[in-house]
Regions:
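Bacterial N-terminal signal peptides that target proteins for export
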Residues: 1-8
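Intrinsically disordered, low-complexity, hydrophilic segments
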Residues: 5, 19-20
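Repetitive helical segments and hydrophobic/amphipathic motifs
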Residues: 11-12
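N-terminal signal peptide c-region/cleavage motif recognized by signal peptidases
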Residues: 15-17
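Primary mode marks residue(s) on the alpha4-beta5-alpha5 output face of response regulator receiver
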Residues: 21-181
């Protein structure tokens, strides 16, 4: 019997790892992921130098990350998108570190003009969740349509007509907006 106790404790210790919960550092970014994709999503943590550490390797194309460290973001700010957009996200983070609003926009405009603006994957979805905390955060979903215009899509470039519309038409930032929260 005395030999059985250490063996039983060892088995329980090993089995406990199989049922362990994710850390808050992983669960927090996954809040923005669609339920049917979250389990298989990759989770990364951005570093100040524009690189990232992989906290959880996923098996689908969705990558999620916390962005509440960026200037002007609320206390709870997480986002998920296609792994194909990581270079775009890195560039966005670089621009977001520019505190002055006018200088920030000028840096983006200059990159658009000189062709160095990284394009997102056409048709990729961006799931963003922002608010003072997770309980009060709101979802915002957009679909990247780099270069899309009203002529190429037939969609308006403003929300006044109702329905879906293209924001930032004709740029690499062009994306489909939908009404609602």
């Amino acid at each position: 019997m005395k030999r059985m106790i250490p063996i039983a404790l060892g088995v329980l210790a090993l089995a406990g790892g199989a049922f362990a919960q994710n850390s808050p550092e992983i669960d927090r970014p996954l809040a923005a992921a669609p339920a049917n994709m979250a389990k298989d999503a990759t989770v990364i943590k951005w570093k100040a130098d524009g690189t990232y550490d992989t906290l959880k390797k996923g098996t689908n194309k969705l990558v999620c990350y916390d962005r509440s460290d960026l200037p002007g973001r609320p206390a709870f700010a997480v986002q998920c998108t296609s792994t194909a957009n990581l270079d775009r996200v890195a560039q966005n983070r670089k621009f977001d570190m520019i505190a002055d609003k006018d200088a920030h926009q000028k840096a983006i405009d200059d990159a658009e003009k000189n062709g160095t603006r990284v394009k997102p994957e056409y048709g990729s979805v961006w799931f963003s969740m922002n608010g003072p905390d997770q309980e009060h955060a709101r979802m915002h979903v957009t679909i990247a349509l780099p270069g899309a215009t009203t002529q190429s899509t037939g969609l308006p470039d403003n929300p006044r007509q109702g329905g879906a519309w293209i924001m930032a038409a004709g740029t690499t930032t062009a994306h489909l907006m939908t009404p609602g929260h």
